Regions:
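N-terminal subdomain of nucleotide-sugar transferases
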Residues: 1-76
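Outer-envelope exported proteins of Gram-negative bacteria
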Residues: 40, 131-133
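A conserved catalytic-core segment of Leloir-type glycosyltransferases
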Residues: 43-125
Length: 140
């Protein structure tokens, strides 16, 4: 089965608390059981330091969001059999090019844009996974 996770955290790339450990642990176990696993996380400035080399996907998209246009690029890498997608959103709001994951006044808006960009890219590349798991309040 093909399972996609959309999450604000995934260890070791972006971790604040237990969510990051749950996502990576669950993903590793699903891969071990023979499933195909994708994990979408925002491209935080600090996330790529923990990843193997990244490659930028040829596909990109743009979408209207809250009165502005958001351009979405995605970088990918493989970590312990898990396909990691880092969603890079460009807009005047500068959603994820910040120093930390949470604690901003616009967190709800930031993560709504991240989920929208992730779903747009999943649709664009015709992944169509039968399971999309949205983790915790930022993505659910």
């Amino acid at each position: 089965m093909h399972i996609t996770h959309i999450t604000p955290e995934c260890a070791p790339f972006a971790k604040v608390g237990g969510l990051a450990d749950v996502v990576v642990g669950l993903s590793k176990e699903l891969v071990r059981q023979g499933h195909t696993v994708d994990v979408f996380i925002p491209l935080y400035p600090f996330a790529s330091h923990h990843l193997p080399p990244l490659s930028k996907m040829d596909e990109s998209c743009c979408f209207a969001f809250g009165g502005e246009t958001v351009v979405c690029y995605v970088y990918k890498s493989i970590y312990e059999g898990i396909q990691i997608y880092l969603v890079d959103l460009h807009s005047t709001s500068n959603f994820f090019h910040r120093d930390r994951i949470y604690g901003y006044e616009d967190d709800v808006r930031r993560f709504l844009a991240f989920v929208k960009g992730s779903l747009e890219m999943i649709s664009l590349v015709k992944k169509n996974p039968p399971v999309i798991h949205l983790h915790d309040w930022p993505t659910a």
